[in-house]
From Swiss-Prot:
Keyword Phosphoprotein attached: yes
Function text: Major role in the synthesis of nucleoside triphosphates other than ATP. The ATP gamma phosphate is transferred to the NDP beta phosphate via a ping-pong mechanism, using a phosphorylated active-site intermediate. (Microbial infection) Catalyzes the phosphorylation of dZDP to dZTP, when the bacterium is infected by a phage that produces the substrate for the synthesis of dZTP (2- amino-2'-deoxyadenosine 5'-triphosphate), which is then used by the phage as a DNA polymerase substrate.
Listed pathway(s): Purine metabolism
Subunit details: Homotetramer.
Protein name (Swiss-Prot/TrEMBL): Nucleoside diphosphate kinase
CDD domains per the UniProt record, alphabetical: NDPk_I
GO terms for biological process, alphabetical: CTP biosynthetic process; GTP biosynthetic process; UTP biosynthetic process
Residues the entry annotates as binding ATP: K10, F58, R86, T92, R103, N113
EC number: 2.7.4.6
GO CC entries: cytoplasm
SS bond partners: none
């Protein structure tokens, strides 16, 4: 199976109508969407998701923000998708993100940086399992697969 990553369009991205733009960037890159849903996360889900930041001063605000509205949760699949997605997304601080990246083009403030992406294989596995049931992920082959990747 190809590598998978978890991507979430945060409430600011949903409210600003950026879902289609962001989905398009991943599709044009050639990655395969295997899971997609819109959900307003519970506090429990948000606290689990951001658990690594529990002792940080911004934790409560982060949880409040991510639970403030709908999030579009996605699982993308493809060769090197985790590293490639991180490049597509750009630096966490939008003012440090390169033009052409999602955050470089669409975000201004670290507290409203539009999107989350897993940073490693272990994180992706944890986040996918947290946000999705196995039955919600679709194993399928695009008809243009031979035009996307060699082999």
């Amino acid at each position: 199976m190809a590598e998978r990553t978890f991507i979430a369009i945060k409430p600011d991205g949903v409210q600003r109508g950026l879902v289609g733009e962001i989905l398009g960037r991943f599709e044009r890159k050639g990655f395969k969407l295997v899971g997609l849903k819109q959900i307003t996360p519970s506090r429990a889900l948000a606290e689990q998701h951001y658990g690594v930041h529990k002792e940080r001063p911004f934790f409560a605000g982060l949880v409040d923000f991510i639970t403030s509205g709908p999030v579009v949760a996605m699982v993308w699949e493809g060769d090197g998708v985790i590293a490639s997605a991180r490049k597509l997304i750009g630096a966490t601080k939008p003012l440090e993100a390169e033009p052409g990246t999602i955050r470089g083009d669409l975000a201004v403030n670290i507290g409203r940086n539009v999107i989350h992406g897993s940073d490693a294989a272990e994180t992706a596995q944890f986040e996918i399992g947290l946000w999705f049931q196995a039955s919600e992920l679709n194993d399928w082959s695009p008809s243009d697969q031979g035009w996307r990747v060699e082999g």
